[in-house]
């Protein structure tokens, strides 16, 4: 029996620290890979195509939607985002876990298609902290920041649809909680049977 990886859906309002937490989680745990989304959003300073996102134009994105190339896709703040269906399926078959950093709309689509996926919502400790983090980025003007804050409350209203809830008040604590979720899922009997097949066979062999 082959060991198949687990698909993790991680959502959070913009500025909650999701990207930093996921990057730290991948650094700590083996066999965890981040799905790189396709987007029509403009590249920000310091970003690289194929590393942060697969940047594309709207026409190309729409063609891929029509071809069924995306596991999920959504429009956020006027930009289109999508997850490659082929890449996710191939990576899970290798036994690696996959993390999708997507909004609640995409999470809803994924859960319907893949009910075995595990969903996690990350909350900021307060709206004031969220606003401070968004302004601290120094990448958006005040109008955009206000739009993001308005969108954040809509996003956060869907927290109850997720399997796990993590509050990013203390970064290391939040990272520990994410790590605990992944490690616990790896100990589920169905996955352990695949990983520990030789051990189980030896233990239960007639002597």
UniProtKB/Swiss-Prot annotation:
NCBIfam families per the UniProt record, alphabetical: guanyl_kin
Catalysed transformations (reactions): GMP + ATP = GDP + ADP
UniProt keyword annotation of Ion transport present: no
Places the protein is found: Cytoplasm
UniProt-listed Enzyme Commission number(s): 2.7.4.8
Protein's name in the database: Guanylate kinase
Gene Ontology terms for molecular function: ATP binding; guanylate kinase activity
Recorded coiled-coil stretches: none
UniProt keyword Chaperone present: no
Upper classification of the organism: Bacteria, Pseudomonadati, Pseudomonadota, Gammaproteobacteria, Oceanospirillales
Domain Guanylate kinase-like: 5-183
Signal sequence, start to end: none
Enzyme class: transferase
Entries under InterPro entries matching the protein: GK/Ca_channel_bsu (IPR008145), Guanylate_kin-like_dom (IPR008144), Guanylate_kinase (IPR017665), Guanylate_kinase_CS (IPR020590), P-loop_NTPase (IPR027417)
Protein's gene: gmk
GO cellular component: cytosol
Predominant location category: cytoplasm
Keywords: ATP-binding, Cytoplasm, Kinase, Nucleotide-binding, Transferase
Family indicated by similarity: Belongs to the guanylate kinase family.
């Amino acid at each position: 029996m082959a060991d198949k990886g687990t698909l993790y859906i991680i959502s959070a309002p913009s500025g909650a620290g999701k990207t930093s937490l996921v990057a730290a989680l991948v650094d700590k745990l083996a066999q965890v890979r981040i799905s790189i989304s396709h987007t029509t959003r403009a590249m920000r300073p310091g970003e690289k195509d194929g590393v942060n996102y697969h940047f594309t134009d709207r026409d190309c994105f729409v063609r891929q939607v029509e071809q069924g190339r995306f596991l999920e896709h959504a429009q956020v703040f006027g930009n289109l985002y999508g997850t490659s269906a082929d890449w996710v399926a191939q990576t899970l078959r290798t036994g690696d876990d996959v993390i999708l950093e997507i909004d609640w709309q995409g999470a809803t689509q994924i859960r319907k298609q893949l009910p075995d996926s595990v969903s996690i919502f990350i909350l900021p400790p307060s709206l004031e902290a969220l606003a401070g983090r968004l302004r601290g980025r120094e990448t958006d003007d005040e109008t955009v920041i206000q739009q993001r804050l308005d969108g954040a409350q809509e996003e956060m209203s869907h927290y109850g649809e997720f399997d796990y809830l993590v509050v990013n008040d203390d970064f290391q604590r939040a990272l520990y909680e994410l790590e605990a979720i992944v490690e616990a899922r790896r100990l589920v009997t169905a996955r352990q049977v695949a990983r520990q097949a030789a051990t189980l066979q030896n233990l239960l062999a007639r002597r």
